[in-house]
């Protein structure tokens, strides 16, 4: 079964072709970072318009790269939500039109499920069950994953997500957009321990997160340093990253202990952070925990994860395949709502 995946939930247009027999055949991505940089964040209307311009050329690109035609497509998976409504509608509209024209079934994919399953695209995918640390954009969650469509929320952020804290800290430090990679790069030059920042909810006794207080602590420090030199900024960035990593790593290990699982999967944009990977690898080795990550190319939003997640859902529940071409979008969508009947 050849599945076309379409991702357009925010500021990346991603398309991919995944074959359930041969694996990932082709994927293409256009990032809008340069377009939004002048605004310091994503402008929804501009994002939607750019998706319109990019999606069909990217479709032709992945077909050419895979040596396939539109008529070879057996099913279409698209990001139904969550995300920016206008951006999601672009992908949904193209998916509906293609599905109708080709008379192939469609399946709407939860964006976070795409991230959750992206490490399964690696050469050595993790077997079920496992604990997943999902740190993508506006989401920070710990999930117990027992199979496709069988997910249990263990803990989540009560306010800012880790990615949002990175972006806001970048602005406080006068860094560019996107903030996460900029903060991480600057932190490489920082001196450990130069600033003392809190580790919110580190000892809360549950698996929830909170990063709003950490952001406020960074703001307080920047105000104290009216004439911040480059080394001070690097030191503060290092203190911030260390605090985030400490909390994410500790909560992940607590989730593994609570569930009894020995495998941890890390997914989402923050999952590309080098310091976080090194800490989790170190702690995993000490505790005999296997830690898995997606390829760096698939940490950010992409079409490959949507094609793969759609293919896995169609294999697990063929009844999801719909020849109805009026699919809408779900900008706000709880991951618990996509539980498959077989997982009940």
From Swiss-Prot:
The gene is tsaD. One of its GO terms (molecular function) is iron ion binding. Its main location: cytoplasm. It catalyses: L-threonylcarbamoyladenylate + adenosine(37) in tRNA = N(6)-L-threonylcarbamoyladenosine(37) in tRNA + AMP + H(+). SUPFAM superfamilies: Actin-like ATPase domain (SSF53067). Its EC number is 2.3.1.234. InterPro entries: ATPase_NBD, Gcp-like_dom, KAE1/TsaD, TsaD. Its cofactor is Fe(2+). Fe cation binds at residues 111, 115, 301. It is found in: Cytoplasm. Substrate binds at residues 134-138, 167, 180, 273. Belongs to the KAE1 / TsaD family. GO terms for cellular component: cytoplasm. It comes from the Bacteria. Keywords: Acyltransferase, Cytoplasm, Iron, Metal-binding, Transferase, tRNA processing. It comes from Cupriavidus necator (strain ATCC 17699 / DSM 428 / KCTC 22496 / NCIMB 10442 / H16 / Stanier 337). It holds the Pfam family TsaD. Required for the formation of a threonylcarbamoyl group on adenosine at position 37 (t(6)A37) in tRNAs that read codons beginning with adenine. Is involved in the transfer of the threonylcarbamoyl moiety of threonylcarbamoyl-AMP (TC-AMP) to the N6 group of A37, together with TsaE and TsaB. TsaD likely plays a direct catalytic role in this reaction. One of its GO terms (biological process) is tRNA threonylcarbamoyladenosine modification. Binds 1 Fe(2+) ion per subunit. This is tRNA N6-adenosine threonylcarbamoyltransferase.
